[in-house]
Amino acid sequence: MPVTKTEIFPYIFYRDVPAALEWLTRAFGFKEEMRTTPPDGGMHAEMSLGDQRIMMGQGSKRWGMISPRESATATMGVFVYLEDVDKHHARARAAGAEIVDAPRDESYGRTYTARDLDGHPWFFTTPPR
């Protein structure tokens, strides 16, 4: 499957958005693009990794959207294309990410799976050349 630019951005809910910003930068190499505090409180932020982007906010039981650490289950994961899965895996492991599946070769490329500080699953893949 060729890598193409997407205009769909996952919106991920965290218990502590500033902590998630720091952790995703350190462990997964994301870059903070913006953060804002809406009038009703909480925080909204956006991050990028290359030309891929994610959004995040404070979880809210009122909206029925909370982190996996609070709900004890994840209902979605984030799939990210990378240039070098093995290098990324080493960085994530060194930063304390929970590695679910070590790097391995699959029909769709080289891939590994990790969980972030709130338990969201992340699937990192380098497509076949």
Indicate where each model-derived feature is located.
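Conserved beta-strand-loop-alpha-helix junction that forms the acyl-donor binding cleft
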Residues: 15-16
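Vicinal oxygen chelate
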Residues: 1-11, 21-117, 124-129
